Design a protein with these regions (language model features):
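An alpha-helical support segment within catalytic cores of ATP-dependent transferases
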Residues: 9-28, 131-184, 188-195
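Conserved N-terminal boundary motif of the eukaryotic protein kinase catalytic domain
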Residues: 27-35
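Acidic active-site catalytic centers that drive phospho-/nucleotidyl reactions
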Residues: 58, 74, 183-185, 190, ...
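Conserved protein kinase catalytic core
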Residues: 64, 107, 191, 208-210
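ATP/Mg2+ or Mg2+-diphosphate-binding catalytic cores
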Residues: 159-163, 247-261
Length: 261
């Protein structure tokens, strides 16, 4: 564990009385680290607890700026979405760390979408989230956003399709659509479900975005084709795949870039 990570983790735990406890199982003493959670590509997260209380402490990456992450916006969105019951309860957040409710359950899989009841529940969660409105925040400019990544790269040898990504971004930017709160990284690993419902986690890439961008990630282009014209759906597909490639390139994982189809 890096010294920075260890320092921030223990500092956050030491200030546990500042957390916003929302249930009867609030700890009487400082929570302790139970285990480091694996699987995340950006940050380092830890399961902590005391007695029946459990939470997740996330230590934010130092590369937040490189990955175009706005931590203040993430916190704003999570606070706004608490009433939907579709996101983990936010207990504490600052620029370096975040503490959220630990959710028992498992992540969604592709096979789960064959379950009509669960599929409908995921759709319902997205509808609840998109129904929450913001005032004066501008919608995401996808061309500017894509260039925030590509401008960091000096070698485009793996990006012969960079022009296609930017054309797709411009197509979406020039479209007539109403922005909604969009997760923008809605991998199955970021959808947890249990007997209480479906929860969307890890909101660090969220912004006001295109209303189909999250549906596309979860349900695929065939689902979206009945909700927009073919040109828009095609542009969203190219854009989403392109942004994923750019993200991996900035991270420096060239193998991952080549393996994305």
């Amino acid at each position: 564990m890096l010294i920075r990570t260890e320092t921030l983790l223990h500092k956050t735990l030491a200030h546990w009385r500042e957390w916003s406890f929302v249930s009867d199982n609030a700890p009487k003493k400082q929570p302790q680290v139970i285990a480091q959670l694996t699987g995340g590509l950006t940050n380092q997260s830890f399961l902590v607890g005391k007695g029946e209380f459990k939470a997740v402490v996330r230590v934010n990456s130092l590369d937040s700026d490189s990955f175009v992450i706005d931590r203040d916006r993430e916190t704003l969105f999570l606070n706004l979405l608490q009433s939907t019951g579709c996101v983990p309860k936010l207990l504490y957040a600052n620029s370096d760390t975040q503490v959220t409710q630990f959710l028992e359950g498992r992540c969604l899989t592709d096979n789960d979408l064959a379950n009509l009841s669960l599929r409908t529940e995921v759709e319902g969660s997205l509808k609840k989230i998109q129904a929450i409105r913001l005032g004066n925040m501008p919608r995401r400019n996808y061309l500017k956003y894509s260039r925030s990544y590509s401008d960091q790269l000096s070698d485009f040898s793996d990006f012969s399709d960079l022009e296609a990504i930017e054309r797709a971004a411009m197509t979406i930017d020039e479209g007539d659509w109403q922005p909604v709160i969009s997760h923008h990284d809605l991998l199955f690993e970021n959808i947890v479900y249990n007997d209480q419902g479906v929860y969307l986690i890890d909101w660090e890439y969220a912004a006001l975005g295109h209303p189909l961008i999250d549906y596309l990630r979860v349900f695929g282009p065939k689902y979206c084709i009945s909700k927009a014209d073919a040109g828009t759906v095609e542009a969203l597909v190219v854009l989403q795949l392109g942004l994923t490639k750019l993200w991996y390139a900035v991270k420096g994982n060239n193998k991952s870039v080549r393996d994305i189809k």
